[in-house]
A protein has these predicted regions:
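A short alpha->loop->secondary-structure connector
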Residues: 28-32, 79-86
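Residue-level signal for inorganic ion chemistry
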Residues: 15, 64, 90, 129, ...
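Short, solvent-exposed secondary-structure boundary/capping segments
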Residues: 137-143, 215
Length: 236
């Protein structure tokens, strides 16, 4: 379900596998948070574990957990003030209406647990993105969210006509989503960058699950994106 990437006295960074629920679903103790907590507490380095952000079930990649209440409060403030830089990778098989830029708008509940992007801007979801051509008419997206809305990145790409491959909600009409080749939802939490108690931290984690994430074309592309914060991002 996960592997530990890094630990300090105040927090732990893990790599979440794809198709793993963050919370318990059905069986108590079966969710990701419960499993991480069980593992970290068994090491005897802390007495409690606190979630500070989350990933959807289909999404793999980097997650941070606080190891004490003070750290949890600090991280809560960092996320609230958007001082944790988050970068994601996604693959779509549909030509987008625009290849880079800004996706911005309020989000509202739709049908079947879905959300939709609105044209209003009262409390908008904000996402910057670049995209890169890949083989087999696929397109790689590097995404930088500036808000933390439910399904934000999935809705953002769907709104420009490029739903994420394997997304069970937003890619129902995608060219290849229903074919056996699709072995996961292709969204991955790739990088985190933040300052905590005066020290700077950077974490980069390329995906290691999914056939499309293992292709030579994909590997060549992300070699050029190993410091995503250095790119000339579209204006907010």
């Amino acid at each position: 379900m996960f592997k530990v990437i890094s630990q300090t006295n105040d927090f732990v960074v893990i790599a979440k596998n794809a198709d793993v629920n963050f919370h318990d679903e059905g069986t108590p103790g079966s969710g990701l948070f419960s499993k991480v907590k069980e593992y970290i507490l068994s090491e005897g380095n802390c007495q409690e574990l606190y979630p500070v952000h989350r990933l959807d079930k289909m999404t793999s990649g980097l997650l941070v957990f606080a190891k004490n209440s003070i750290s949890a409060k600090i991280f809560g403030e960092l996320f609230e003030k958007h001082q944790v830089e988050k970068y994601y990778l996604a693959i779509s098989d549909t030509k987008p209406t625009k290849k880079q830029g800004l996706i911005k708008g309020d989000m509202a509940k739709s049908r079947r647990g879905m959300f939709k992007l609105m044209r209003t801007m009262e409390n908008p979801a904000i996402t910057q993105f670049f995209s890169y051509s890949m083989e087999n008419k696929q397109r790689l997206y590097l995404l930088k969210p500036h808000s933390g809305k439910t399904h934000q990145l999935r809705v953002a790409l769907s709104s420009i006509g490029a739903p994420i491959i394997g997304d069970p909600l937003y890619a129902s009409n995608s060219n290849i989503t229903s074919k056996p080749l699709v072995d996961r939802g292709y969204l991955h939490a790739y990088a985190l960058r933040f300052e905590f108690l005066g020290e700077s931290y950077e974490f980069i984690l390329p995906p290691d699950e999914g056939a499309f994430f293992q292709s030579d074309c994909f590997t060549d592309r992300i070699e050029q994106l190993n410091k995503p914060w250095l790119l000339n991002w579209p204006k907010l």
